[in-house]
Amino acid sequence: MSNSDNPKNGADFQKKVRVWFEKKYNLKFELEKKIAIGNPPKDHKFDIVCESKKIAIECKRYTWTETGNVPSAKMGAANEAAFYLSFLSEEYDKYIVMLRTYTQKRDESLAEYYYRTYKHLIGDIHVLEYDPDNDVMQEIKGDINTEGVC
């Protein structure tokens, strides 16, 4: 797979995550939804947003490098997603959903590594990992309880 496949693979992953959340919450979610953040407010496009604007999700379809090392630049992009999510009000449930990808070299998934390394930056953001082949979402940090979310 070449880097030119990344945008399509990322978009496919995003759509699968949206479908999973729609089934989980029995609600409609929008892709690439703009929400005003900051002061003065400026629109930012979040990957997936609940129609009632109570859930915002950023999707990260990252993998370990071929040699099992950390994709450092991609972790910076995940931190940027956390930064934007942090500007949303407390009424939002905020999620970073990462592709389930595991390496024996470190005996952990990339989402587990991300949370372990950057939890001081994550705050009230839920970190989940999704296995699209088996349609399984796993919580790394947070609670994906459906009561009163949206």
Name what the model sees in each region.
Residues 60-117:
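Catalytic cores of nucleic-acid endonucleases
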Residues 36-41, 103-106:
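Acidic-and-aromatic substrate-binding clefts and catalytic sites of carbohydrate-active enzymes
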Residues 42-44, 80:
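Alpha-helical scaffolding within the catalytic cores
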Residues 44-60:
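Active-site beta-strand-loop-beta-strand hairpin of nuclease catalytic cores
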Residues 26-28, 91, 124:
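A generic structural signal for alpha->beta connector loops
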Residues 95-150:
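Domain-level recognition of nuclease-like catalytic cores that cleave nucleotide substrates
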Residues 18-29, 43, 69-70, 112-118:
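Catalytic phosphate/metal-binding cores of nucleic-acid and nucleotide-processing enzymes, i.e., regions
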Residues 1-36:
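Acidic-basic catalytic patches of nuclease active cores, encompassing PD-(D/E)XK
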